[in-house]
C-alpha cells in the first residue's frame, strides 16, 4: 500500500551544524539526498526534514526567506510514544544547542517544544492512546 510522505523544507544558516544537531537527537542523514547545500534528515519512514542552505532554499521560492529567530513560519509537531520520550527528545535538543520552549500538560496529552539552531519551532507531543481511540 502506498504511504504518502511529507518533506519539510527549512532554510538553515549552516548545513553542517544542522546535520550535527539532528544526529545528536538520534535522527539519521540520508547521504543520497544530502550535499554541502542540503541535509536530508530522516525522521521516520514517511517524514523527512530537508535542511537547505538559504542560497539553495532561495532557488525554490520567489518569497523572502523568513528569519525563524524573529518570525514564526511554521510549527512542526511530531508525535512521541510516551511522556518520557517527549522529555528525552527535547532534552537532547537543548543539550545539542537548541532552545527549550513551552511545556503543555493536559493529563491525557503532554508536549514540550524546542527551537532548533535556526529558530525553527518543533513541538513534540504524546497523547494517551486510550483517548485517541475514543
Question: Which role does the model predict for each range below?
Answer:
Residues 1-17, 73-78, 128-134:
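N-terminal beta-strand motif that seeds the catalytic metal site of vicinal oxygen chelate
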Residues 4, 37, 45-47, 72, ...:
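Residues that flank catalytic or metal-binding motifs in active/ligand-binding sites
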Residues 9-57:
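Core segments of cupin and vicinal oxygen chelate
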Residues 22-25, 67-69, 124-129:
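Membrane-topology and secretion signals of cell-surface/extracellular proteins
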Residues 40, 90-134:
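Vicinal oxygen chelate
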Residues 61-66:
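Short beta-strand/turn micro-motifs at beta-sheet edges
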Residues 70, 74-91, 97-98:
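Mid-chain, well-packed structural core segment of small domains
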Amino acid at each position: 500500500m502506498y504511504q504518502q510522505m511529507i518533506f519539510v523544507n527549512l532554510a538553515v544558516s549552516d548545513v553542517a551544524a544542522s546535520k550535527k544537531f539532528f544526529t545528536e537527537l538520534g535522527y539519521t542523514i540520508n547521504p543520497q539526498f544530502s550535499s554541502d547545500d542540503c541535509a536530508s534528515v530522516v525522521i521516520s519512514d514517511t517524514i523527512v526534514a530537508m535542511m537547505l542552505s538559504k542560497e539553495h532554499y532561495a532557488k525554490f521560492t520567489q518569497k523572502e526567506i523568513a528569519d525563524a529567530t524573529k518570525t514564526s513560519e511554521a510549527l512542526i509537531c511530531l508525535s512521541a510514544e510516551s511522556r518520557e520520550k517527549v522529555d528525552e527528545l527535547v532534552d537532547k535538543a537543548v543539550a545539542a544547542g537548541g532552545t527549550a520552549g513551552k511545556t503543555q500538560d493536559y493529563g491525557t496529552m503532554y508536549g514540550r517544544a524546542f527551537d532548533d539552531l535556526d529558530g525553527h519551532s518543533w513541538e513534540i507531543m504524546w497523547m494517551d492512546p486510550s483517548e485517541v481511540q475514543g
